[in-house]
């Protein structure tokens, strides 16, 4: 039987300089292959890692778009449909680790975690994604993460769509055989911030939720301290680095770690409590404790509420981030934090669920491979780019504000003019509605002694008939009183009679 390979559609879109999106549509029952070249390694002796993940076939609805998380942080990224975000999970397929040697890479470790039927991933000189006898269960998004040392991760995406077949059930994932180990439910709960006055005694309470375990185990709690630094705007905790502290991107210098909590290795450990023979049954955990000399006389664990602790006579230098890590059989399994500070030293704390270098900020970097000096200067250059974007945004916002003020002023003047004109028209209208003189008496009326009240309304015609003598041209002025509350209107009339 001959296998017919056909690649129907392959389009590549450059995304923010650090990612490629390949879109493949394959008819059901056919096969397709796409090759994704590797990024050239840079420094000999460094690690080069690749990880393939898969988001299942709920994610056929995809697109690329311009995303702005903040006014100055915008980038082009992959946009997924609502069904993808609601029903699908990103499944890790395999991870390969290489070492860079003379400009090439040599594989030193490979681990297949899950498998998708009819999908083959090649790990040779250049990666290949092969689809044989495609069915709808193969559809989805395949993502390759590539990283050389501690440099910015590269992202390659292959969106696979399968045409002309009814929906199959989701594939049965094949998992490798691994040694089983007992596990327990372990979590820590506490308040995340506490503000104190200098000289206070404070209690930091942490509740431990421990599920049942069939075996005797080792339980250890470590209290790590990241001191407050006035140059920090906020503090960031990189959660993956708590569970994998030896990852290259988690290990940083002391100067770089003043504002973020990454590897446990870089952070001062001020206290620890360890129990070798712990059980969730009738036996109670008995801990051996150790306190760092910097807080020896002031910090003590609260028993039996370990890892809760009490600190006496707290000072300004005690302000900062305290992270409690729980290790089950020597393996980090849970963690929590509390930020202790005075009012003046309070900072916000943000939890980041990626290792340093991942996430949307990595897309802001230039896509080209940089040398050592350029890599060390990335932080300052990205800050300059953000500042430039902020300046443009501020100028635009100021211009819009000035324009809005001008529009309000001009509109107010126009409204005032219209109101004034309307009042004049209303005044003239009221004057026209009230009785007025048909003709005005002159000084040569002779014996006529008609009161002014009789010249209005019903007596107007009568008065006009009685008048026979022609009046000479003269000027006269009279005041018309409309009402007590109405405005006074003076009208000059030139009479021609």
From Swiss-Prot:
Intravirion topological domain residue ranges: 420-497
Keyword Transmembrane helix: yes
Transmembrane segments: 399-419
Virion surface side of membrane: 1-398
Post-translational modification, as annotated: Phosphorylated within the acidic cluster. Phosphorylation determines whether endocytosed viral gE traffics to the trans-Golgi network or recycles to the cell membrane.
Domain of life: Viruses
Signal sequence region: none
InterPro entries per UniProt: Herpes_gE_N, Herpes_glycopE_Fc, Ig-like_dom_sf, Ig-like_fold
Record GO cellular component, one term: virion membrane
Localization annotation: Virion membrane; Host cell membrane; Host cell junction; Host Golgi apparatus membrane
Keywords: Glycoprotein, Host cell junction, Host cell membrane, Host endosome, Host Golgi apparatus, Host membrane, Membrane, Transmembrane, Transmembrane helix, Viral envelope protein, Virion
Membrane topology: Single-pass type I membrane protein; Single-pass membrane protein
Residues of this chain annotated as glycosylated in UniProt: 60, 133, 148, 203, 277, 366, 388
Main location: virion
Pfam families noted in UniProt: Herpes_gE (PF02480), Herpes_gE_N (PF20418)
Binding partners and assembly: Interacts with gI.
Family: Belongs to the alphaherpesvirinae glycoprotein E family.
Its job: In epithelial cells, the heterodimer gE/gI is required for the cell-to-cell spread of the virus, by sorting nascent virions to cell junctions. Once the virus reaches the cell junctions, virus particles can spread to adjacent cells extremely rapidly through interactions with cellular receptors that accumulate at these junctions. Implicated in basolateral spread in polarized cells. In neuronal cells, gE/gI is essential for the anterograde spread of the infection throughout the host nervous system.
Protein name: Envelope glycoprotein E
Lineage: Viruses, Duplodnaviria, Heunggongvirae, Peploviricota, Herviviricetes
Originating gene: MDV096
